[in-house]
């Protein structure tokens, strides 16, 4: 099972033995990030296909992750339409993230898609950064408002869509303390935090 789809398969599809179409990116065992690491955070990005990154200032963290990924992918291989995408919960996050990206002075990054889950449905990127944007209980209620129960399981459609948009790597950012109030996000944080 592809790393980015294992959680949705287990939690939302009741392990219905979904089999991915055998594509080359699904068979890769390591991420192709050849540049030397700047620090331990780079090492984490290189080692994990799915990773939860705790953050209070998500826009700054997302911009920093974009800078690091761009450095690893390299200007020759980077393609804004395929390499990286950012999914957000709230439209106002787009402006916050773009403002932080402008500070990086990397013009190629300005062309990446940053949009809500609904707008990402049907498209994919090699790397997806999902900025959850949850700072309080009200935000968490909004984030999980599309959940429903089926056969005794809680299914979160937005989370399912977001987690299955990544071809190679899924990075999620958010407020750990608030997200842990929800059983599904608590499990994600437990599985994918380092």
Segments and roles (model prediction):
Residues 1-68, 123-125, 161-167, 171-194:
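Helicase-core coupling region on the C-terminal RecA-like lobe
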Residues 60, 76, 120, 145-151:
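Short, contiguous acidic/charged loop-to-helix segments that flank catalytic cores in large enzymes
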Residues 25-31, 102, 116-118:
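Conserved P-loop NTPase motor core of helicases/translocases
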Residues 142-170:
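Conserved SF2 helicase motif VI
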Residues 115, 123-135, 145, 170-172:
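A short beta-strand element within the Helicase C-terminal
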Residues 57, 91-93, 119, 134-137, ...:
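Short, glycine-/Ser/Thr-/acidic-enriched flexible segments
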Residues 68-114:
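Conserved helicase motor "Helicase C" RecA-like lobe of SF1/SF2 P-loop NTPases
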Residues 2, 60-64, 91, 95, ...:
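Feature representing long, continuous alpha-helical segments
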